[in-house]
Amino acid sequence: AQVYAASGYRLDAFDDVAVEPIDVAEVLRQELGSKASQIVVDGDQPFATGSFAQVYHCRVVDRPGSRYIIKILRPSVVRYLNFDFVALRFCCWAGQFMLKNDIFPLVEIADEFIKTTKRETDYQRELITAQAIREYFARRTDRVVVPETLAEYSTRRILVQDYIEGLPLTEVVERAQAGNDTYQFVKDQLGSDMQQQLVTVGSEFLIAILQADIIMADPHPGNI
């Protein structure tokens, strides 16, 4: 946290993207059909936003007493990405043609980027990954908690997961940038040792890279 604070690194790009108006009820109806009534979203404003998705607090009717979140793919993402993909591939093709470049395969690089980005917008794939990561850490240690993803309420456009109380690393860093004692703040809020937690997360991520079949490969501050 102190390293980020000292660098003056901007964090708003990680988890403070502008909110896009989404008709959540309509998305649920389209994605879940008759099961849509099982998801009750708390309010119409997301509590977290990203470049591809917005996240809302919600309740699941057939699982009373627990708190959940629903991650919804921004409707504009697919629309704009399809246009961007065509433009990117054309520019790479034109560049490769004009430069007569056979060493640096621009079109192949563009195709790989497009394939990877499409995977990022498919929450069925993310569901499989989330379940695999949860199972790995459940077998390995009780020091890392991964939320459960509800497969019966998840589709290509939405994910429903249980809500785990905590502090995002971005908030901790912002407090450090303001000159606050972040270690004491985390201890007061959660009763935990931030330094030990960061060491645990860092070491477990490194071990997972070597041992796990599937890893979470995007541990930026907005995701921790």
Per-range role (PLM):
Residues 216:
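Histidine-centered phosphotransfer motif of kinases
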Residues 219-224:
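Hydrophobic residue at the +6 position relative to the catalytic HRD Asp in the kinase catalytic loop
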Residues 1-208, 213:
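Broad phosphate/nucleotide-binding scaffolds in NTP-utilizing and phosphate-metabolizing enzymes
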